UniProtKB/Swiss-Prot annotation:
NCBIfam families the record matches: myo_inos_iolB
Enzyme Commission number: 5.3.1.30
Protein name: 5-deoxy-glucuronate isomerase
Organism of derivation: Listeria monocytogenes serotype 4b (strain CLIP80459)
Pathway given in the UniProt record: Polyol metabolism; myo-inositol degradation into acetyl-CoA; acetyl-CoA from myo-inositol: step 4/7
Alphabetized SUPFAM superfamilies for the sequence: RmlC-like cupins
């Protein structure tokens, strides 16, 4: 296994709570991005005290109640399966606060997205209806995007969070692009994590992470609930026929701006009629 591919941990940390993924600065090459995926059983309560990190809690599947201080967001979440392809609810929580997540349905799958808290901001419910929806690409390069925390949002100080759906036979994050240089307005420096789900679950997709000089060049067969770390470089995704892909992206860097640079060898595909 390469250093960028993370298989599910499936580590039961408490009754009714299982860590599927746990990516942080201590166990990865990332300096700005953190990610946890937890699976919860009904009635289980997960609590976390944030220090210098802010967090976006995404109700991937099932219903949850999120509490922080006097803020209580009860039974949020819109879908039983991410492949319903409808937006879901999320909650943003700033650094220095303690929050709880309680599972309200028999099963709940929750994503915890982290980055540096650059300033104190109010705890905010990001409703499913607040997500902007985009259809991007053409030919075999089509995908559906749900923007949870885009760079135009003022809810967070550093976090960027987005969901992407790619149907079988298509590529996404394509043509290959990168955002690893602090060179605005042309390109921003953003680390990224990918959390993948696949339908049906026995499938796999391919993801390559590479730099211009190929000092980093990993191509991975990525399975259901795997995560991929992108500290730098281009990072395209290819989805085999017969399977659909979902991934949740978390991005963060020194500036909260998403400006990417396409691989010049492959940018020509954008010029087709």
């Amino acid at each position: 296994m390469g250093k960028l591919l993370r298989k599910p941990l499936n580590e039961r940390i408490a009754p009714g709570i299982t860590f599927v993924q746990d990516i942080n600065q201590a166990n990865s090459p990332l300096s700005y991005v953190g990610f946890r995926l937890i699976e919860m059983e009904k009635g289980a309560i997960y609590q976390e005290e944030l220090t210098d990190l802010e967090c976006c809690i995404v109700a991937l599947t099932g219903k949850i109640t999120v509490s922080e201080g006097d803020n209580i967001f009860a039974e949020i979440g819109t879908r039983a399966n991410v492949f319903e392809k409808i937006p879901t609810d999320s909650v943003f929580i700033s650094g220095g606060r303690t929050f709880q997540v309680k599972a309200d349905t028999e099963k709940a799958r929750v994503a915890l997205c982290y980055s540096q808290a650059n300033r104190d901001l109010p705890t905010t419910l990001i409703k499913a209806s607040d997500n902007s929806i985009e259809q991007r690409g053409k030919y075999q390069n089509k995908r559906l995007v749900h923007n949870i925390l885009p760079d135009v949002s003022e809810v967070a100080s550093s976090l960027l969070v987005v969901e992407v759906y790619t149907d079988g036979g298509n590529f996404s994050s394509y043509p290959p692009h990168k955002h690893d240089r602090d060179n605005l307005p042309a390109e921003s420096l953003l680390e990224e994590s990918y959390y993948h789900e696949i339908n049906p679950e026995q499938g796999f997709i391919f993801q390559r992470v590479y730099t211009d000089d190929r000092t980093l060049d990993e191509t991975m067969a990525v399975e259901h609930q795997n995560a991929v770390i992108v500290p730098e470089g281009y990072h395209p995704v290819g989805v085999p026929d017969g399977y659909d892909s979902y991934y949740l992206n978390v991005m963060a860097g020194p500036k909260r701006v998403w400006k990417f640079h396409n691989d010049p060898d492959h940018e020509w595909i954008l010029e087709r009629d």
